[in-house]
Amino acid sequence: MNALVVGATGLCGAAILKHAAEATSFNKVYALVRRQIPNSAARVETIVNEQSDSWPESVPAGVDVFFSGLGTTRANAGGLENQYKVDHDLNIAVAKAAKERGCRVCVIVSAIGASVNARLPYNKLKGDIERDLLALEFERTVILRPGVLLGERETHHKGFGNSVAVFLGKLVYRGRFQALLGYPVYGDEVGQVAVALALSDDKSKVRIVESAEILSLVKQENTQ
């Protein structure tokens, strides 16, 4: 079984790559990136393509599971339109290419509050991604909706609001007030659950996992 990871330099994508590389169920784990990344795992093969617009053409055949932790912020992208091109357009284009090459399972990191009817642009963006991803009709689709994401990022996410949310998220993590921030979760926990669910015996065509369940699944995984 082979896997493809996009967004492998981001917080959740890097965690997915790490856990997928550790999973003996995968023979090979491809990481589609714009620049070379350091990784000593024997089963990881990096596909470097600086032109992300042509990423769909770089998707290898023989991939069974498509993982995406691909995403950016409006500030980092330089506006909502550019953010949409990365978060939505690129995700869907690569997922479609993977599906056309025989991929059966799709696991993507979305966000809490994702909805096509959301008033907030970010939540609507994530809702649009989920809608169009489901339209591709993979045999199995897993959508993870984490709350505030915690952990060390390779690149800084601009924006005062994001910094405040992370600061508060660390304070309430797994505490009595965690629900107020949508159950903050570490990127590594998201990656762990993404890989575990991709390899699970769950036959559900669509599974949506909210942040509270991500935390619960991590606890279950770590006590086995």
UniProtKB/Swiss-Prot annotation:
Any one GO CC term of this protein is: mitochondrial outer membrane
Is Zinc among the key words of this record? no
Please name the GO terms of the biological process aspect recorded for this protein, alphabetically. import into nucleus
| Keyword Membrane in annotation | yes
Q: Name one Pfam family in it.
A: NAD_binding_10
What does the UniProt entry say about where the protein is found?
Answer: Mitochondrion outer membrane
- Cross-referenced InterPro entries: NAD(P)-bd_dom (IPR016040), NAD(P)-bd_dom_sf (IPR036291)
- Organelle targeting sequence: 1-44
UniProt main location, coarse:
mitochondrion
- Bilayer topology annotation: Peripheral membrane protein
What are the protein's UniProt keywords?
Membrane, Mitochondrion, Mitochondrion outer membrane, Transit peptide
Q: Which family does it belong to?
A: Belongs to the FMP52 family.
Q: What is this protein called?
A: Protein FMP52, mitochondrial
